[in-house]
């Protein structure tokens, strides 16, 4: 059994440092049904999936923001003082339909400030992009309080641009169509 007070304090401090408003809480996963529910919603095919399957945790940290994004926080096995933060598939979305869009979780330092910065820089842009693609495919209905600007925010999410550099804005034009050959000239016209 791990120290749940340390996990609760870490989750709370990370939530205060992430951009936007995140609600921290602890989830009781001591019953196998509760752990299975979290495991089925986990949007990570890497180390976090392994950690949930192979190691015992009776509590998990949970973070939820106003857009409906959810993250799970747990101590990293075999690495004292480190944690794992991974996204959950949005509520109402079938996990099997978005498996190919998996944004994967991150291993973070035990310092809440560094952990929040790692999640902000590496995890949240990947999560926003995966949600954007799922929304375009019609697999995810979008955030509950969509203000019309989420697509631009997701498309302009910065990962590690130098200060003062403007990010490139990418707008989706919808699904790509195959090129159509132009008869008699050996050229292919763009869609």
Residue ranges and their predicted role:
Residues 22, 88-91, 123-125:
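Aromatic-residue detector
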Residues 1, 47-117, 178-181, 186-191:
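Intrinsically disordered, low-complexity regulatory segments enriched in Ser/Thr/Pro
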Residues 95-154:
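Surface-exposed beta-loop interaction hotspot
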Residues 1-63, 132-185:
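Negatively charged, low-complexity tracts enriched in Asp/Glu with abundant Ser/Thr
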């Amino acid at each position: 059994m791990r120290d749940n007070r340390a996990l609760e304090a870490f989750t709370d401090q990370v939530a205060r440092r992430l951009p936007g408003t995140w609600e921290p809480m602890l989830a009781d996963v001591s019953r196998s049904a509760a752990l299975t529910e979290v495991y089925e919603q986990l949007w990570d095919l890497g180390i976090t999936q392994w950690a949930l399957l192979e190691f015992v945790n009776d509590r998990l940290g949970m973070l939820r923001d106003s857009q409906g994004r959810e993250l799970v926080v747990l101590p990293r096995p075999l690495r004292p003082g480190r944690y794992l933060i991974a996204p959950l598939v949005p509520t109402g979305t079938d996990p099997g339909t978005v498996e190919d869009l998996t944004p994967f979780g991150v291993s973070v330092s035990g310092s809440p400030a560094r952990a929040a910065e790692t999640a902000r820089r590496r995890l949240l842009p990947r999560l926003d992009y995966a949600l954007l693609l799922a929304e375009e495919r019609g697999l995810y209905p979008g955030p509950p309080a969509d203000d019309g600007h989420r697509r631009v925010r997701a498309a302009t999410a910065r990962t590690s641009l130098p200060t003062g550099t403007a990010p490139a804005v990418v707008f989706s034009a919808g699904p790509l169509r195959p090129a159509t050959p132009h008869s008699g000239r050996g050229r292919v016209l763009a869609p």
